Curated annotation (Swiss-Prot):
Catalytic EC class: hydrolase
Protein name per UniProt: Ubiquitin-like domain-containing CTD phosphatase
SMART domains reported for this sequence: CPDc (SM00577), UBQ (SM00213)
Cellular localization per UniProt: Nucleus
Keyword flag Nucleus: yes
Length: 340
């Protein structure tokens, strides 16, 4: 990752020209260099920032985009680019600096907005919208999963969020281990026997690697992490009632590693239900782990979920399970499903 300098905050100028009604090409000048950014008109400002981050390493939350005669519209991450009249003669300006060192202070970690629940019918609608499918296909073409350890044939896949799932990222402590969810290593050790493990966070890869290293997850002798995914793997989807928001499409993993993972052998834990709106059948909404100092002696979520994971691992296909009822699932359910 490029390092920041002591020079004044760099700015980026972008000229745009349409290739088709759907695709835009932005020439971005940043820090003395020019980059070409291709983006579709049905993408959002959030996606534009994500693309710029991929090229410049300026995190989306550090970017300020300016464009003549539209006021502060570009401060709205949910705004669709199709609503802006780009002209080749005008330039967009991005103000932002590269972060060389991540601030470990928990108050500096990314904000998590309140979760909301989509109705069952609308969740299906979001998943099946052609515009959202197109966004997923584009992300599949753009993103590369770097494997830390080889995928294991015959193993199921467990995808885990970080913030409020494995770690209380808002409380403060002298040692990050004090904010780790209880029984994390025992949980991952047990799960690893039946599942490959991937960590997917809505933050930068640098922050993911730092946090997982601090918690002792990446160098644990009892289990291995197959891959880490960051915010660049996410997509922005459109909902009729909730507008535009980011989510984590498991279809990305299934498309890039089809010989190992599929809807029938994958489960994802996240405290935000909307993150698996593109694959609701595979998501389990975990109880958020907040206020670690007050709750770490009583939180048993990972203990109970360990039993659930090991129980359903006996099934050949997980796609028919209702993970919202996981607490009432038992060995008897497995036997009954085998007999069906």
């Amino acid at each position: 990752m490029a390092s920041s300098s002591s020079s004044p905050t760099p700015s980026a100028a972008a000229a745009v020209s349409p290739l088709t009604e759907e695709e835009l090409t932005l020439t971005v000048k940043w820090n003395g260099k020019e980059y070409t950014v291709r983006i579709c008109a049905d993408d959002s400002v959030a996606e534009l920032k994500r693309r710029i981050c991929l090229l410049t390493t300026v995190l989306p939350k550090r970017q300020k985009l300016l464009y003549p005669k539209i006021g502060n519209k570009l401060s709205d991450d949910s705004l669709l680019l199709s609503s802006i009249s780009f002209k080749p003669s005008l330039k967009m300006t991005m103000i932002g600096t590269v972060e060389d060192d991540i601030i470990v202070d928990q108050a500096e970690s990314p904000e998590i907005v309140d979760d909301f629940e989509l109705g069952k019918e609308e969740a299906v609608d979001v998943k099946d919208k052609e515009v959202n499918k197109q966004k997923l296909r584009r992300r599949i073409d753009q993103y590369k999963i770097n494997l830390r350890t080889p995928c294991r044939q015959g193993k199921k896949l467990l995808v885990l969020d970080i913030d409020y799932t494995l770690f209380d990222h808002r409380s403060t402590a002298e040692n990050p281990l004090q904010l780790m969810r209880p029984y994390l290593h025992e949980f991952l050790t047990a799960a690893y026997a039946e599942y490959d493990i991937m960590i997917w966070s809505a933050t930068s890869m640098k922050w993911v690697e730092l946090k997982m290293t601090e918690l002792g997850v990446l160098n644990n002798p009892n289990y291995k992490v197959t891959a880490l995914l960051d915010h660049l793997a996410m997509i922005t989807v459109q909902s009729d009632t909730r507008g535009i928001f980011d989510c984590k499409p498991l279809g990305l993993i299934w498309a890039l590693l089809p010989e190992f993972y599929n809807p029938g052998n994958t489960i994802m834990f996240d405290d935000l239900r909307r993150n698996f709106v593109m694959n609701p059948q595979n998501g389990l909404t975990i109880k958020p782990f907040r206020k670690a100092h007050a709750n770490r002696d009583t939180d048993q979520e990972l203990v109970k979920l360990t039993q659930y994971l090991l129980t359903i691992a006996e099934l050949s296909d997980l796609s028919s399970l209702h993970h919202s009822r996981w607490e009432s699932f038992s060995q008897d359910n497995v036997k009954r499903r085998r007999q069906e």
